[in-house]
Amino acid sequence: MKALYMVFVLWVLIGCFLSSECQRGFRGQHDPTRPLSPSNPSSHFYPQPDPNRVQISQPDNIPIFMFEQPHSLNICVPPPPLYLGEEFEKLPPNTHIPYILIRPDIEPPSKYIQPVPRKKSNATPAANNFITTATAPNSTDSF
């Protein structure tokens, strides 16, 4: 049963993680709805000059698509379906299951079983029981 709980918890956590990733985008990507920080706006729009004035050129033997920026791709995958076992697959879709036996050797409870009458306990304590709380009249203990 613990394994079923672990599967359920992982299912919920993965679903929450994926839903939050789809709403805010992956880490490190720019959110176009958020304004840019006003600290240094020029660094966002223009490339910084190379202090050594070295131009990096694209080699001729490598295809151009390797140098392109990848597009942001958010993939929303629903959590996997909960698998309950083969015995549930065999049932028709509208089958009502009144109870599920945990152990097959136990009969289901009957509506007509009478409860066992209970005995009243004796309210007076036995003579050898001593009261040792601080509220007892002759208490020698100090708490």
Curated annotation (Swiss-Prot):
Signal peptide: 1-22
Pfam families the UniProt entry points to: PROL5-SMR
Subcellular location: Secreted
Coiled coil, from the record: none
GO cellular component: extracellular region
Top-level taxon in the UniProt lineage: Eukaryota
Keywords tagged on the record: Detoxification, Secreted, Signal
Gene Ontology biological process terms in this record: response to toxic substance
Residue stretches of biased makeup (Polar residues): 36-45
Location of region: Disordered: 28-50
Major localisation: secreted
Secreted among keywords: yes
Role played: May play a role in protection or detoxification.
Protein's UniProt name: Submaxillary gland androgen-regulated protein 2, isoform gamma
Originating organism: Mus musculus
Lineage start: Eukaryota, Metazoa, Chordata, Craniata, Vertebrata
